């Protein structure tokens, strides 16, 4: 199975600019690019911060932009999102029994679990006992290898201002996955606006640049210095799944540099 991973689209009302770039246009360009170059992808996943201010019109535009995608689209909220407005504009989105936007899908041989770390009014992530109980049940009810999708990382990534707004009170999350770590084959994040890959307690993780603006790589500034922004080029990921391999390619979809044959 092949799917596309996008994150942090940050659409705004009226389709204007944000930090000197146009998030709505950037998303349209991403969609057009992967529809042309990856037509055999079977799904699109967007890991949160779908909009920047949570405006109804921004979700309306998101729905319109994604309407041309001829494959299933799976969304989760980020800290910039409003869960209630997502449900208004995407009424078929699945939720757990407590109203959190959490659900599972079969991705080929894998169980894909989509998690909700949104907490209204704050930038950091929250994963409460209700969400933890739901996650643990999904893990217990399946024997498949697992892909986790969530907006906030649950460990530090070294950019201190971003770490300050990652998942807080990680115990409920870690309790939920305890004993299932060996089945978690890949964790996909948003929130960071940087291409990062590695592993945490032997669980591989991956995140990438957003489609509008990025976070600069500064591993020295203190947390209270503010999040350092940059207008680096946006990306999407092409993820290829088999039982033997999880392969992730990163596409700089606005790159227009010439292609040429490498000889000798």
Show where each model-derived region lies.
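Binuclear metal-dependent phosphoesterase catalytic core
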Residues: 21-24, 176, 199-264
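Active-site-proximal beta-strand elements of phosphoester/diester hydrolases
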Residues: 1-13, 109-119, 147-149, 203-209, ...
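His/acidic metal-ligating clusters that form di-metal
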Residues: 30-43, 124-206, 238, 246
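Short glycine-enriched, charge-decorated loop/helix-capping segments at active-site entrances
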Residues: 16-22, 91-92, 121, 159-166, ...
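N-terminal active-site segment of His-dependent metallophosphoesterases
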Residues: 1-61, 65, 141, 157
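Extended active-site neighborhood of metal-dependent phosphoesterases/phosphodiesterases
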Residues: 56-136, 169-184, 198-201, 209, ...
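Active-site environment of divalent metal-dependent phosphoester hydrolases
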Residues: 12-15, 52-57, 79-86, 120-123, ...
């Amino acid at each position: 199975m092949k799917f596309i991973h996008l994150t942090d689209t940050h659409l705004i009302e009226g389709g204007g600019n944000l930090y000197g770039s146009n998030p709505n246009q950037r998303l349209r360009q991403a969609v057009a690019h992967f529809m042309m170059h990856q037509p055999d992808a079977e799904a699109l996943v967007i890991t949160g911060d779908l909009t920047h201010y949570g405006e109804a019109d921004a979700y309306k535009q998101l729905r319109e932009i994604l309407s041309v995608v001829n494959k299933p689209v799976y969304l989760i909220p980020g800290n910039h999102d409003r869960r209630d407005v997502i449900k208004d504009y995407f009424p078929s989105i699945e939720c757990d029994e407590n109203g959190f936007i959490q659900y599972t899908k079969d991705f080929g041989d894998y169980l894909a679990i989509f998690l909700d770390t949104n907490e209204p009014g704050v930038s950091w992530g929250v994963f409460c006992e209700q969400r933890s109980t739901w996650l643990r049940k999904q893990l217990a009810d399946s024997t498949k290898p697992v892909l986790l999708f969530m907006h906030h990382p649950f460990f530090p990534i070294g950019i201190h201002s971003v770490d300050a707004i990652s998942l807080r009170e990680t115990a409920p999350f870690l309790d939920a996955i305890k004993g299932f770590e060996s089945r978690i084959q890949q964790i996909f994040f948003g929130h960071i606006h940087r291409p990062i890959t590695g592993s945490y307690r032997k669980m591989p993780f991956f995140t990438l640049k957003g489609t509008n603006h990025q976070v600069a790589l500064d591993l020295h500034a203190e947390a209270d210095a503010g999040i350092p922004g940059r207008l680096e080029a946006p990306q999407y990921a092409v993820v290829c799944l088999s039982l033997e391999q999880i392969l992730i390619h990163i596409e700089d979809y606005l790159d227009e540099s010439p292609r040429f044959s490498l000889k000798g």
